[in-house]
From Swiss-Prot:
Catalytic reaction equation(s): guanosine(37) in tRNA + S-adenosyl-L-methionine = N(1)-methylguanosine(37) in tRNA + S-adenosyl-L-homocysteine + H(+)
Keywords on record: Cytoplasm, Methyltransferase, S-adenosyl-L-methionine, Transferase, tRNA processing
Organism of derivation: Clostridium perfringens (strain ATCC 13124 / DSM 756 / JCM 1290 / NCIMB 6125 / NCTC 8237 / Type A)
UniProt-recorded name of the protein: tRNA (guanine-N(1)-)-methyltransferase
Lineage of the organism: Bacteria, Bacillati, Bacillota, Clostridia, Eubacteriales
GO BP, sorted A to Z: tRNA N1-guanine methylation
Subcellular localization: Cytoplasm
Gene: trmD
Chain sites annotated for binding S-adenosyl-L-methionine: 110, 129-134
Any one annotated GO CC term: cytosol
CDD domains: TrmD-like
Amino acid sequence: MKINILTLFPEMFDIFKHSIIGRARENGFLHIETVNIRDYTLNKHKKVDDYPYGGGAGMVMTPQPVVDAIKAVKEKNKGKVIFLGPRGKTFNQEMAKELSKEEELIFVCGHYEGIDQRVYKYFDLEISLGDFVLTGGEMACIPVIDSISRLVPGVLGSEESFQDESYYDGTLEYPQYTRPFEFEGEKVPEVLMSGHHENIRKWRRKQSLLITKERRPDMFEKIKLSKEDIKLLKSK
């Protein structure tokens, strides 16, 4: 997958040079490039923002440099243009799975009080992380790209790495344990030490369902419970 990020602050995405995403880039599974929107402004002072018409606090990103940056990237990349903003569709795991199937994606990060409305016709999709405000689109773009990238084949090395995680199948993840067997008087559940794979699978499924029911009842209501799920929930 190839990802282009249009931003005023390319250095904020240096985080993708490290850890799993960094290794995936080195191994050729991901290609992430940043494009500085400021490089496309025609303003001799490299200015990319101005006061809003009608008054109001803050500054608004001017349309020319953003549109020219999008057009330049689109000449070589045909991916969807995605804007991170509060009016967008709320991002979730299902959206991450769908976007991970794309060969190319182009992200546009807004800043200040937003982007001139006349730029919006160039966006194929608008995404929001939720009902809260961030200092810029970059802060929202990072987790979105990370969530999508880790689902790209080869990035994690194995599909099992993400299939057991929270949200993948509409439930929260079951509890995880590692050494030591006993810590501060609390022991690892015996079933995990049994070596009985079927019993371990059932225990994990039950815990996943119980945790989801307790902490995210909104998610639990959407789960299509199997006969086994119902039996597990009734068991002690």
